Amino acid sequence: MHPMEVRLRHALKTLSLFLVFLLSATAPLLALPAPMDDAELMEKSHLVALVRVLSVGCTSVTKDEQSGEELPGYLATLQVLEVKKGDVKPGDELMVTWRAIPTGIIGPWVVYYYPGEEVWTHLTKRSGGVTYASTSWNARGELVKPAQITKLPIKVGESVTITSKPKE
């Protein structure tokens, strides 16, 4: 085989491997949804409210199929402070669920809630249930008050709760 042919084959193999690597690395990013604008968030949400996060508990730990990482599932109790949309009133409490995402994922593609914080949020009611979920990964709005606790539990049955509820 001519030396030029050998170099050309080597270059093509290297380029092919690089393209396979590039496509496999960016494929998960291509599947992520675009952020919803304010109008779409309002339209698709069952509830838009200012809430105070009272507690967060770890309800499950499941292995992620792609990363193999053990990821906690959470249940937060939120107290409604103000309502822009929805059938709840100030003082009502509701539950929101979410699952952590693998640490290697770019973005935060999930909304986390931390005890003590007061934040505007957009939620959808889970079908057939009593809990809510974030409408989109960008459903978290303006932070009105920072969290008292920023480390969430990672073992099933553990929970973190604010020390006291401020008086209305």
Place the predicted regions along the sequence by residue:
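Bacterial N-terminal signal peptides that target proteins for export
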Residues: M4-S16
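Bacterial N-terminal signal peptides
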Residues: T14-T26
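Transition segments tied to proteolytic processing and entry into folded domains
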Residues: T26-E168
